[in-house]
């Protein structure tokens, strides 16, 4: 399949059903890594219903199907927090890398100073991607189940 045809666009109030379907399709590992306690789903659906200036959400589509999400929390700060997820059956095809690069470029063009994110300590594939793209691991988060990564634009790809 040609993944070059993926489009990344801002999420709108018409995307609620696609967002719900995206989260419903997540397998156990994806839920554990990305949607523990259903928090990311709740925030994404809430954003569809009532957009906030403190957040930015984007949806990646292929043939009309949501194959990825990328979002920023705390957008009104100099270094917002990034979240990325790829639909299970599309993982391992470079879509996550494309979404992170999109996010890096978008934040940089918006005069942000960098990006911060957390990832589950067992999510080795994501850690490798973030490090490949120039993120530095700062250590474990207070719950010791997540690692904190930062990308300062002086370090960027």
Language-model regions, residue ranges each:
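A short beta-loop-alpha structural element at the N-terminal edge
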Residues: 6-19
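Acetyl-CoA-dependent GNAT
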Residues: 10-13, 24-83, 87, 154
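A conserved beta-turn-beta hairpin within the catalytic core of GNAT-like acetyltransferases
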Residues: 74-82, 91, 113, 143-145
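Conserved acetyl-CoA-binding loop-helix of GNAT-fold acetyltransferases
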Residues: 92-105, 128-132
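C-terminal "cap" of GNAT-fold acetyltransferases
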Residues: 113-127, 131-133, 139-157
């Amino acid at each position: 399949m040609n993944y070059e045809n993926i489009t990344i666009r801002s999420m709108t109030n018409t995307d609620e059903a696609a967002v719900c379907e995206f989260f419903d399709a997540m397998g156990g590992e994806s839920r554990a890594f990305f949607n523990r306690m259903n928090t990311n789903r709740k925030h994404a659906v809430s954003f569809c219903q009532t957009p906030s200036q403190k957040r930015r959400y984007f949806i990646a589509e292929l043939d009309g199907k949501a194959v990825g999400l990328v979002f920023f929390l705390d957008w009104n700060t100099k270094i917002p927090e990034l979240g990325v997820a790829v639909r299970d059956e599309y993982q391992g095809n470079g879509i996550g890398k494309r979404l992170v690069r999109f996010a890096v470029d978008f934040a940089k063009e918006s005069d942000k100073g960098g990006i911060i994110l957390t990832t589950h300590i067992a999510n080795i594939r994501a850690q490798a991607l973030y490090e490949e793209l120039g993120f530095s691991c700062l250590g474990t988060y207070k719950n010791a189940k997540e690692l904190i990564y930062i990308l300062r634009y002086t370090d960027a790809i």
